[in-house]
Regions:
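Nucleotide/phosphate-binding catalytic cleft detector across ATP-hydrolyzing
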Residues: 1-43, 59-185
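Short beta-strand scaffold segments in enzyme catalytic cores
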Residues: 44, 51-56
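Gly/Ser/Thr-rich loops at beta-strand to alpha-helix junctions
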Residues: 49-51, 149
Length: 185
């Protein structure tokens, strides 16, 4: 039987949120892999359908985070909710002062998301320092997700891109729960 990442599954993290059942399993899986690989206080960003930001301490406390619309959802909203804006391919344009609508939309979507990322990460770092006593310079920022490569060159706060973070986290959770699953079967 498949292993479902849900409440009760061993992760090695201590979930410090109001209702742990509300935390998406993808966020937990990414946090498990990042905490396993890096023993620093962490901010894990997943550039997927939504862009999620998660804070994890070096002791494995999952503190919570922020959820923003992903770049593709934002592009879809512009196309579907405006009268004349076209569908655009997601590409990093060369300029922010754009001479046409398509490049203007691409600029707003990509550079806007880069700015959102920098702002949220900076705010989370400040909270980790002020509310949790973490050393600002020790906080490592890990990014993953299909759209991470698109923003990596423009987002200075990202320390490393981990393309396999979710898969690595699933393997780690499977290993932590393997013996428990054998007893049930």
């Amino acid at each position: 039987s498949p292993l479902v990442v849900e409440t009760g599954v061993k992760t090695g993290l201590k979930i410090k949120c109001d209702d742990p059942r509300q935390i998406g399993s993808d966020r937990i899986v990414n946090a498990v892999a990042a905490h396993h690989k890096y023993k620093n206080p962490l901010i894990v960003i997943d550039f997927g359908t939504a862009t999620t930001f998660c804070a994890i301490t070096e002791d494995g406390d999952y503190l919570g985070g922020t959820i923003a619309p992903g770049i593709k959802i934002s592009a879809k909203a512009l196309f579907e909710q405006t009268a004349k804006l076209p569908h655009v391919d997601l590409e990093v344009p060369g300029n922010m002062i754009c001479k046409n609508t398509i490049e203007g939309m691409q600029s707003g979507l990509v550079y806007g998301h880069m700015g959102l990322t920098e702002y949220i990460v900076e705010g989370m770092k400040k909270e980790l320092v002020e509310n949790y006593g973490k050393d600002y310079d020790a906080i490592k920022v890990i990014a993953t997700g299909g759209l991470a490569p698109m923003v990596e060159n423009g987002v200075k706060c990202i320390d490393v891109i981990e393309k396999r973070l979710t898969l690595d986290g699933l393997v780690l959770i499977y290993e932590k729960n393997k013996s428990q699953r054998k007893k049930r079967n």
